[in-house]
A protein has these predicted regions:
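His/Asp/Glu-rich mid-to-C-terminal helical/loop segments that flank catalytic regions of hydrolases
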Residues: 236-270
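Polyanion-binding loop/helix "lid" in catalytic or ligand-binding cores
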Residues: 147-158, 184, 196, 252-264
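Active-site/ligand-binding-proximal alpha/beta "capping" segment
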Residues: 163, 169-205, 263
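Zn-dependent metallopeptidase/amidohydrolase metal-coordination segment
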Residues: 209-247
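Metabolite-binding pocket within alpha/beta catalytic cores that recognizes anionic/polar moieties
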Residues: 1-154
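Short acidic/polar active-site loop segments enriched in Thr and Asp
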Residues: 104, 205, 224
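Non-catalytic positions within long, well-ordered alpha-helices that form the structural scaffold/packing
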Residues: 98-102, 200, 219
Length: 270
């Protein structure tokens, strides 16, 4: 796997020598943020040898290199998911690659279902911790010694220091911020009401199909991690509404301006 990472990095370096300080993964419906930054270079996933390609509507499938204010960043405009048929090692390959490019901190964003009944569609949730019991760990298999230790500590996946910065950014921007635990399930189907009752009993506040595995891979290689979920719908059984992907995009569009404001402030502050 490390050789594959090196090959992907070489492929990118043939196209740009841009060195990001921070990385951002843009979730479903949130990819338009990449159009708002000062862009220096775009590298499509299809241009990178051996790179997994996103197939989901609302995920463009490219790295965007550029600046948020004066901060050099790399944005993933579209991620790959386990449910697309990729191995978990391939799912986290882009995260690891951004770390190898030079990014020391990563902001993970996603569209998520609200499990906590006090949440509402359009809320932002600071991810304080996660549950990945239902999906394979990206660290299964031979350990990549060049990246990190065999048995990494996960007692603080999401940096408490960065969490405090996000809280301050939200307050400064006048944007209400929920907080909670994110649980990653496999997808692509939405969850049943019984499954939602189960994860709520585990302590989950939001549910989705990505992010936690990327956070684990990033922490394994020593990156500082923070995360924000956009609650685009209430999970099955929490409300009577039927679930569909169009609703995810509609809610993300509705809060796009607040998302842009919050993410810009966070990137410059972390």
């Amino acid at each position: 796997m490390y050789k594959k990472l090196e090959k992907c990095l070489k492929s990118i370096r043939e196209k740009t020598d841009f060195k990001p300080e921070k990385a951002v993964i843009l979730g479903s419906g949130l990819g338009d943020y990449a159009e708002k930054i000062k862009r220096e270079k775009i590298v499509k996933y299809t241009e990178i040898e051996g790179f997994p390609v996103s197939t989901v509507q609302g995920h463009k499938g490219q790295f965007v290199f550029g600046y948020v204010k004066d901060v050099p960043v790399v944005l993933m405009q579209g991620r790959v998911h386990y449910y697309e048929g990729y191995s978990m090692q391939d799912v986290v390959l882009p995260t690891r690659l951004m770390g190898m490019m030079g990014a020391k901190k990563v902001l993970l964003t996603n569209a998520a279902g609200g499990v906590n009944p006090s949440f509402r569609p359009g809320d932002f949730m600071l991810i304080t911790d996660h549950i990945t019991t239902a999906v394979p760990s990206p660290l299964i298999g031979p350990n990549i010694e060049e990246l990190g230790t065999r048995f990494p500590d996960m007692s603080e996946v999401y940096s408490k220091k960065l969490q405090d910065i996000i809280r301050k950014s939200a307050k400064d921007c006048g944007i209400p911020l929920q907080e909670g635990v994110y649980v990653q399930l496999t997808g692509p189907n939405y969850e049943t009401p019984a499954e939602i009752r189960m994860v709520r009993s585990w302590g989950a506040d939001a549910v989705g199909m990505s992010t936690a595995c990327e956070a684990m891979a990033a922490r394994h290689m020593g990156m500082e991690v923070c995360g924000i979920s956009c609650i685009t719908n209430m999970a099955a059984g929490v409300s009577d509404a039927k679930l569909n992907h169009a609703e995810v995009q509609e809610t993300a569009d509705r809060v796009a301006k607040d998302f842009e404001k919050l993410v810009t402030d966070v990137i410059t502050a972390i």
